[in-house]
From Swiss-Prot:
Tissue localization of expression: Detected in heart; expression is highest in the SA node and the right atrium, and barely detectable in the ventricle.
Function: Ancillary protein that functions as a regulatory subunit of the voltage-gated potassium (Kv) channel complex composed of pore-forming and potassium-conducting alpha subunits and of regulatory beta subunits. KCNE2 beta subunit modulates the gating kinetics and enhances stability of the channel complex. Alters the gating of the delayed rectifier Kv channel containing KCNB1 alpha subunit. Associates with KCNH2/HERG alpha subunit Kv channel to form the rapidly activating component of the delayed rectifying potassium current (IKr) in heart.
Source organism per UniProt: Oryctolagus cuniculus (Rabbit)
Family the UniProt entry places it in: Belongs to the potassium channel KCNE family.
Pfam families linked to this entry: ISK_Channel (PF02060)
Gene Ontology molecular functions: delayed rectifier potassium channel activity; potassium channel regulator activity; transmembrane transporter binding; voltage-gated potassium channel activity involved in ventricular cardiac muscle cell action potential repolarization
GO cellular component, one term: apical plasma membrane
Entry protein name: Potassium voltage-gated channel subfamily E member 2
Keyword Coiled coil: no
Taxonomic path: Eukaryota, Metazoa, Chordata, Craniata, Vertebrata
Length: 71
């Protein structure tokens, strides 16, 4: 009977540690996602300017493709 008590105690400690780790991972993930959608300048640059940068790169690529170099 005493052995069975230690088995239950061991299982409860292991489940508690596992639960603590899972909760810590979830909380850190939620915090990082919340911080990601803030109004910091880097995030605003990504949200607003990436399409303009992409279009300018495509136009520059098209210009470079049409260039003829003579020897």
């Amino acid at each position: 009977a005493e052995n069975f008590y230690y088995v239950i105690l061991y299982l409860m400690v292991m489940i508690g540690m596992f639960s603590f780790i899972i909760v810590a991972i979830l909380v850190s993930t939620v915090k990082s996602k919340r911080r990601e959608h803030s109004n910091d300048p880097y995030h605003q640059y990504i949200v607003e300017d990436w399409q303009e940068k992409y279009k300018s790169q495509i136009l520059h690529f098209e210009e470079a493709k049409a260039t003829i170099h003579e020897n």
